UniProtKB/Swiss-Prot annotation:
GO terms assigned for molecular function: acetylglutamate kinase activity; ATP binding
Catalyzed reactions: N-acetyl-L-glutamate + ATP = N-acetyl-L-glutamyl 5-phosphate + ADP
Pathway field: Amino-acid biosynthesis; L-arginine biosynthesis; N(2)-acetyl-L-ornithine from L-glutamate: step 2/4
Region (Disordered): 1-42, 329-362
The protein's name: Acetylglutamate kinase
Source taxonomy: Bacteria, Bacillati, Actinomycetota, Actinomycetes, Frankiales
Function, as annotated: Catalyzes the ATP-dependent phosphorylation of N-acetyl-L-glutamate.
PANTHER family, sorted: N-ACETYLGLUTAMATE SYNTHASE, N-ACETYLGLUTAMATE SYNTHASE, MITOCHONDRIAL
Annotated Pro residues bias: 1-11
Organism of provenance: Frankia casuarinae (strain DSM 45818 / CECT 9043 / HFP020203 / CcI3)
Location in the cell: Cytoplasm
Amino acid sequence: MNAPTRTPPPSNGGHGSTGSTGSTGDAAPGGGTGRGPAATARGHAALAKTQVLIEALPWLSRFQGATIVVKYGGNAMTEPALREAFAADVVFLRHSGLRVVVVHGGGPQITAHLERLGVPSTFVGGLRVTTPQTMDVVRMVLLGQVNRDVVGLVNDHGPFAVGLSGEDANLFTARRRPAIVDGREVDVGLVGDIVEVRPETINALLGSGKVPVVASVARGVDGGVYNVNADTAAAELAVALGATKLVVLTDVEGLYADWPASDEVISELSITELEQLLPSLTAGMIPKMEACRRAVRGGVPQAHVLDGRVPHAVLLEIFTDDGIGTLIMAESGTSPEPGTPPAPAARPAGIVPAGEPTGGTP
């Protein structure tokens, strides 16, 4: 389809010239030609917008048909303006030819609902103690509230989102996980580690042009239902799908070089460099960086940790030359240039063993 074009102004022999009728061109209020400072400013603004589009072009070309898994959480999930921006980003990616999967938790929403029920929230070793009563609330909130909210937000911008959980079609299979406190195992209830991923359903949805939105609960090998970490779930799914990128939204700018002594953000680092830093990271960042490490070690070319407080953070990272946040790659200095061959296609459908356990729970 041809792009629409602007209708050119009528020719009058040039600025200030007169034709046989004595016309001096399009008059503006006050006798000017409409080419004053306001028009110039509009032209500069339009030019800036075209520069943004041109900068995005090689990245749009490179990632055409690529699969991207986004772990959605933090302020981007709770602040109305950021929620709208995220949903718009997802639909923009879909219209740009990318295959997008959203994985979410919902820790704050679960805690708030438990408080309303008078049920205290207890955490041991970063894991929510999940009794059968608590697990009922986790499922209800993640599937009945958070998942429906995310699906609705995305579908307000385009009818693509389909909600499901790790239980559906046995997408995730989990095994019970204890917490480790002072070197000892502590039972925390229905908390699990993902041990298998069946990506067939997600691949089918992606193949039909949909955007799967996945809640982080899993069916257990024992037939039970388990609360699983959303960062880890996103990483395992990215590996199983053969994704090009894993994107993790956080409430910080990225990985800091020497926190708290410095607020300098590391722009990119290799997986080896990340593994050297892991023991020194703060507790809140460890599960996110462990998820990135798992994804890259599992064959995902790139993992990103982004500040979800920045509107349209996902688009800024993927479609601009500088990006934002922290990029983790297989080897330092090997971030792909626009126009390089895309990552391998998704793995064939089937059961994909998951990696080692990481992260806390919602």
